[in-house]
Amino acid sequence: MKNLIDIAGKVSSIKKIFLIFVFVLISGLTLQAEAPAIIIPEGLKPGDTIGLIAPANYKGTSADAEVEYLLSRGFNVVYGRSYDSRWYGFGGTDYIRAKDINDMFANKNIKAIFSIRGGYGTIRIVDKLDYDLIRKNPKIFSGFSDLTTLLLAINEKTGLVTFHGPMSSNFDKIPETTENGFNKAFTDKQSYNLLEFDDSYSIMKSGRGEGKITGGNLSLVVASLGTEYEINTDGKILFIEEVNEATYRVDRMLKQLKLAGKLKNIKGIILGDFKGAKRSELDDMSLEDVFIDNFGDMKIPIIKGFKSGHVRPFITVPIGANAKIDTYKNEIIIEKSVK
């Protein structure tokens, strides 16, 4: 009898130890899943140095317009090795392109890093960035299109606000709207309204919502799914844009986001211009039908036709910044994108 009692006592102790282990494990996983705190980079001022890189496709056409604009604003410009490098279609080898980014974040004299071109290639280097280094040396990091991969990864891994911002082609005869958006995002330390720069957007669904902005180019957002760098949309405002995609492809990507649970708990949607989206067959859905089919039953504010991405003018969007949408006031208020 005594032996049975001893055994029962040991089993009970083992159960307690097991339950404690499970609790600690779950607590650890919960802590790991928590998003890092927001890190707001310092704003630009005349005399600051901006690093130019080509982390995706090689430079190709001239980036003179961007350089001239930055110099005219009183900024200094330095060039990464990738700026004039070429390896296949990329701005140098994966090593060169990743090292450019790591080196520029480590360089205390460089206050911002601007990408000059998208295309393809950032997914090849996303796992080669030193995210701890980036977190400890926060600064403006900007680009769009294929750069979406890095904008999301850096923001998700470090909490640093990144920028879905203009690249070389956007600086050629720069529209006033683009310049105003540039100034607010990169130099103004106050809150501002993303919708103040251009009134060509429309309201698809009225409402109010609040959360961090995340997103970028739709193809690259979808490409992040299932990876260590997967987009986190929970409790956030989703911004997506695309260019020259058939409407059935847009529909497929939106369905993939939905099936992955990425539309489940979002607080608002900002739809970009989706320039060049056309039916590939006569019986394909129109872009408007695709949006209605995917978002029609959602009870959140939705704005469409927002000018950011593969379009002129271009309004810079701070990825990871706190924002409030109020369609009744025609506002997307950015709390702060730089300090």
Predicted region positions:
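Conserved anion/nucleotide-ligand pocket segment
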Residues: 160-220
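ATP/nucleoside-binding phosphotransfer catalytic cores, i.e., glycine-rich phosphate-binding loops
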Residues: 276-339
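Buried hydrophobic positions in well-ordered alpha/beta secondary-structure cores of metabolic enzymes
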Residues: 52, 113, 146, 221, ...
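Internal helical hairpin/lid segments
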Residues: 232-287
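Short, acidic/small-residue loops that bind anionic groups at enzyme active sites
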Residues: 131-153, 161-168, 301
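ATP/NTP phosphate-donor binding region
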Residues: 33-109
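Bacterial N-terminal signal peptides
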Residues: 17-28
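N-terminal secretory signal peptides that target proteins for export/translocation
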Residues: 1-13
